[in-house]
Structure formats: structure tokens, C-alpha cells
Swiss-Prot record:
Complexes and interactors: Homodimer.
Family, per entry: Belongs to the RNA methyltransferase TrmD family.
Name of the protein: tRNA (guanine-N(1)-)-methyltransferase
Gene: trmD
Organism: Ruegeria sp. (strain TM1040) (Silicibacter sp.)
Cellular component terms (Gene Ontology): cytosol
Chief place of localization: cytoplasm
Length: 244
């Protein structure tokens, strides 16, 4: 177990996993890694294996009713969850990374960033005993409509998307306000030096210094890209505009 003392007021992610060595992984790099070192957020892993049954610390068994694969046992997960939830208080959801869960989006990440912390259960094999999800009221969350070999990568994606919304992590609040989904639209194109590359020039308006025209261009491009690439987001954006 990598138990770490809770710092008052600091957002914390607790990870229940068979592969604790997979963390922090990419979360230990760049801005999230720097913020972790600075104590702006915390990470704790809980290894499921020590909670296993018998001499071999078995954590799984065959599916009731037959079928392929193995299922993580309810008694093993229950003990691990109760260990992980010791000392947690306030708004602290239990999350299970699962392809049948609600798909992650920016609004969900904003909600998670306002929590006191999260406990994330990373599945393996054919999943987890359903009784665990029911007993603890666990929320199922999905990275997308595809199946992975385990929940660790999805957990890292969720944590990264959440941690970057915590005040002080990015250093510039405008960065989160201007990026994709913050306004319900996809982000406008970005450019930097050189001004001309392989015959492709930066749009003149961005070099004009006219902030009003730049803002208008960026809004127009965000709307155009959203309409072309994500008609679902565009329809929702139009519906919100019609109500204002």
C-alpha cells in the first residue's frame, strides 16, 4: 500500500489496482507531475493483491453461470475498498472504470475537480462482482465505446483531465477557459512561429494585433469546427443559445 497522509484541503486520488507500479505513470510528468510534487494534489495506490484469498492471494474466480474469463471477487474488493475509504470525508465519490459506464466529458471532470477526492477502482479480466457496485453505490465511468485490458489507463486519463482544472495546476486560468469544451465548442486552431512554414502562413488576422478581430475569428473558427466535426455538440450549443 502506498498510504499517504491526507493534506487538509488538497484533492486526492486513491487508486485500487492490481498494478500499483503503473502509477503515477504519465501523471508524474509535465504540469501534473510538477503539481503533484508541489502538493497541489495527491495520489495514493492501493494494491488489490494483499487482500486476496488463501496462500496464493487469489483475487478472482470463474463467472457464476459459466462463461469465459475471470471476475474480481466481492470479498476481496470489499476489504480493499473499505481500507481505501478510511479517512475520506466530504464529497468523495467511488468510481469504477468500465466501458458500460457514463462516458467522460468536460462537465464530469469539472464536477470531479470540485470534489474532495476520488477513489478509482481499476478492473481486470471480465470485470468485478456486481454486488460490489451495488453495495457501495459505485459510479461507473467510461473512457469511450471500446474495451481495454484494464482500467489503469482510463484512470490516468480521468485524473489528468480533472487535476488540470484544480486552481494553480496550469498556472494560467485562461488556458482552461479557452480550450475545447469549456464553452461548449471545440477549440479554435492554434499557431506559433515561424510565420511561414512550407508555404503555409499564419492567418493575417492573428498577426494584426487587433484583439477584437482576433477574438471574433477564434469564435467563428470554433463554431465552424464544432459544426463540422461534432454535430452533437453543435446542436447542444445552439439549443443553449436559443434560451438566452
Amino acid at each position: 500500500m502506498s498510504d499517504t497522509p491526507d493534506l487538509a484541503g488538497v484533492w486526492k486520488a486513491k487508486i485500487l489496482t492490481l498494478f500499483p507500479e503503473a502509477f503515477p505513470g504519465v501523471l508524474g510528468e509535465s504540469l501534473t507531475g510538477k503539481a503533484l510534487q508541489q502538493g497541489l494534489w495527491q495520489l495514493e495506490t492501493v494494491d488489490l493483491r494483499p487482500f486476496g484469498i488463501g496462500k496464493h492471494k487469489n483475487v478472482d474466480d470463474t463467472p457464476a453461470g459459466g462463461g469465459a474469463g475471470m471476475v474480481l471477487r466481492a470479498d476481496v474488493l470489499g476489504d480493499a475498498i473499505e481500507h481505501a475509504m478510511q479517512g475520506t470525508a466530504g464529497n468523495w465519490p467511488l468510481i469504477y472504470l468500465s466501458p458500460r459506464g457514463r462516458r467522460m466529458d468536460q462537465q464530469m471532470m469539472q464536477t470531479f475537480a470540485r470534489c474532495d477526492g476520488l477513489t478509482l477502482l481499476c478492473g481486470r479480466f471480465e470485470g468485478v462482482d456486481e454486488r460490489v457496485l451495488e453495495h457501495y453505490g459505485i459510479q461507473e465511468v467510461s473512457l469511450g465505446d471500446f474495451v481495454m485490458t484494464g482500467g489503469e489507463l482510463a484512470a490516468q486519463a480521468l485524473i489528468d483531465a480533472t487535476v488540470r482544472l484544480i486552481p494553480g495546476v496550469l498556472g494560467n486560468q485562461a488556458s482552461t477557459e479557452e480550450e475545447s469544451f469549456s464553452s461548449g465548442l471545440l477549440e479554435h486552431p492554434q499557431y506559433t512561429r515561424p510565420a511561414d512554414w512550407k508555404g503555409r502562413a499564419i492567418p493575417d488576422v492573428l498577426m494584426s494585433g487587433h484583439h477584437g478581430k482576433i477574438a471574433e475569428w477564434r469564435q467563428d473558427m470554433s463554431e465552424k469546427i464544432t459544426q463540422e466535426r461534432r454535430p452533437d455538440l453543435w446542436a447542444a450549443y445552439q439549443a443553449r443559445k436559443s434560451k438566452t
